[in-house]
Amino acid sequence: MNRRSFMAQAAGVALTAHEALLPAPARAGVQALDRVAGAVSQPGPGVGPDVSRYRLTRDRVLNGTGPAYTRDFLLADVRAIPERRFTNFSGDLSGRWIGALSASSRSFGEQFPMLQDVVNSTIALQHEDGYFGGKFHYDQPNDDDLALLWGNGRLLVGLMEYCALNPDPAVLGAAIKLGDFLLRIAPRFNSQAMADAFSADHYASSYICWTQQTEGLAALYAATRDERYRKLCAEISKRISRRPGDHVHGYLTSLRGALDLHDVTGDAAYLNQVTAAWQDVVHSGDLLITGGVPERWSPKRERTEGCAECDWLRLNLGLYRATADAKYLDIAQETYFNEFSMNQFASGDFGHGKLNTAGLTETVMVRAWWCCTLHGLRTFADLNNAAFRVMKNEVFFDFPIDSRVSSQGFAAEAKSDLARNGEVRIDVHAAGKGQRLSVFKPAWADRVTLRRNGTAVSGLSLEGIAAGDVVVVQYDMSLHAKEFGAAARRLHFGPWLLGISSGANPTYSGELQAQNLFDLSTFRAIPGRALSVFQVPAAAGQMRYKSAEFPDQPAEVELVAVAEQTANPPETWQLVVPVDPAAG
């Protein structure tokens, strides 16, 4: 069976990968997948780094080990069997798995035979009261009850994602039953008393376990139009609060649910709430230079978390979709090309990075298979769906990644060579009469130019796009230094943040390395650098520095995009460089 390609469905995106360019662990995963009936892909062209990232995580979820996502392993949290970590978060892992594969199936046109079996087995374990997992204590809820609510919230979202893929009355019935359970407990839980009782100190079992129900309730309202779910979602949205030290993933998920409620109702109040919260995050001091966010808000800012990075990326994509304000798309791209990519392990997992006191990622070492890996997989569908926007007679190409679209009479495929030469090629397969293609110019691009069928054109819009047209988008990029404190700089090439990795520079590390002084004027590209699918050869360069330990000897370091972490075992990174004042 050919697993080298995908088939697009309406309003979806289809992509493929080039296995020969994958690192050995990922290549082995693809080859192993071909030997099992885990996924059924359809023929279709397309090669590139972005789809390779999707396939890397997809294949890890379907066929990976350490641990393997078997049926019984997934169901342990709805059976409340303590055979693995975090089964008290009842429905968390199982719900994320269902949601990630359902969304991937819709977006990429793939089929996952195991999906229906897991869904049917899950809903068969629902309590008569409507919830899943261990016993729920109505009268005196404790941390385990909040954990159960968290997992049930993720499961509600997963069931609704499955219903969007396959409108199954039994699955929708289970989701409604779970929604009615939330209605039943709402008078107690949607209160300031509960918010105070489960403060940020409770972390993963804090009050965000309740507020994150907005996402599932908004989806349930969209499917049923039952006003009870809309009203409860709206009331919970009023309880969303960014508390010091609280769980970022839970907070951002709550906001995404409020934004979903805006999308389904058109009520600007919810959009205004989310945009105000976005401004608060941006000015909080907790927005990292990688474009990501920490696992916990300050003063507990110690690690990153893949789930939170995915939420921040998805929230910005959603805000751009709702407002068409370029600032949201610019941040989404910064997050994807840096924090999201850096957080993806060579195994396909997502997880945690260690932050220093300045909020800089030093290493990404903890694979969080219990949440982040599946949340990462779910995010690829949103990324792929965001690349093109089809709005009647105008098509927008917003996100320069490998992607396909087939919607409203328009069909096209984008193949990215951005990391090598700054180009993205768009092949138009179908277009309606009078349709126009417009290309977004991101903030990181010095200039964007278009060629249509080999001929340069002026501007960023093409009138009368037609089937058979080949559009090449050229993104001109250069090195930019941005201040980090008074004497240090962070270096960017195009959308990529550059860093000094221990893998590329095995002799660089030392006790005084933070005091090394760099001459930015000596940066030069590295010619002929070996290309692998997760490398960014266009951004790589070398730079001279004065060693704090041996200043009289000339020294040079290699800087690469932090996104290249995916191609390697966990490494240590230096993300900012002190500037040598003597270099001018």
Task: Name each model-derived stretch.
Residues 29-113, 142-166, 207-228, 232, ...:
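Aromatic (Trp/Tyr) and acidic
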Residues 241-244:
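Solenoid-like repeat scaffolds
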Residues 52, 233, 274, 329-420, ...:
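C-terminal beta-rich recognition modules with glycine/proline-rich loops and embedded aromatic residues
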Residues 449-470, 476-485:
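A surface-exposed beta-strand-loop module
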Residues 5-27:
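N-terminal export signals
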Residues 139-146, 172, 178-204:
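Asp-box/WD-like beta-propeller blade repeats and closely related beta-sheet repeat scaffolds
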Residues 97, 110-143, 173, 285-293, ...:
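Helix-terminus loop motifs that line ligand-binding clefts
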